[in-house]
A protein has these predicted regions:
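Ligand-binding loop in jelly-roll beta-barrel domains
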Residues: 94-115
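Glycine- and acidic-residue-biased ligand/ion/polar-headgroup-sensing regions
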Residues: 61-73, 78
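Conserved short histidine dyad/triad with adjacent acidic residue
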Residues: 31, 44-60
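Histidine-centered metal-chelating micro-motifs
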Residues: 53-55, 90, 94-99
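A short, N-terminal "cap"/entry segment at the start of jelly-roll beta-barrel domains
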Residues: 1-40, 55
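Structural motif
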Residues: 72-74, 81, 97, 107
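Short acidic-glycine-tyrosine-enriched beta hairpin
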Residues: 79-94
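A cytosolic small-molecule/anion-sensing beta-strand core signal
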Residues: 69-70, 85-86, 104
Length: 115
């Protein structure tokens, strides 16, 4: 394999839970830009608990991709609200205000990509 190529292989059970930057829920960071040398902020397996809320916020330079693996959330983006359940995908462009209200314990894959 060429020296400039990076292969990263992990099982999620080997990755410690850490608090989210919003102070709600917990996540296991699967990969970061530093590790893979690509313009991702992070790829994380995120767990949010029923009743939690990720307050309205904005990422000026980061697009977010959410893939819901279980549970239920209401995600408000600017003036629209989306009910998200298992197997749903949601893209939030950089610069959009968004908030997550957790209806049922939710497991999701979150991918942040710098613009």
């Amino acid at each position: 394999m060429p020296k400039d190529k990076v292969v990263l292989h992990r099982h999620s059970a080997q990755i410690e839970f850490v608090p989210t930057s919003h102070g709600v829920g917990e996540k296991r960071i699967i990969a970061t830009q530093t590790e893979v040398g690509k313009p991702i902020t992070q790829i994380a397996r995120t767990l949010l608990r029923a009743g939690e809320q990720v307050a309205m916020h904005i990422h000026p330079t980061m697009d977010e991709h959410f893939f819901f693996m279980g549970g239920e959330c209401r995600v408000s983006i600017d003036n629209s609200t989306y009910n998200c359940v298992a197997d749903d995908y949601l893209f939030i462009p950089a610069g959009c205000n968004h908030q997550i209200d957790v209806v049922k314990d939710t497991l999701m894959l979150t991918i942040g990509i710098e613009k």
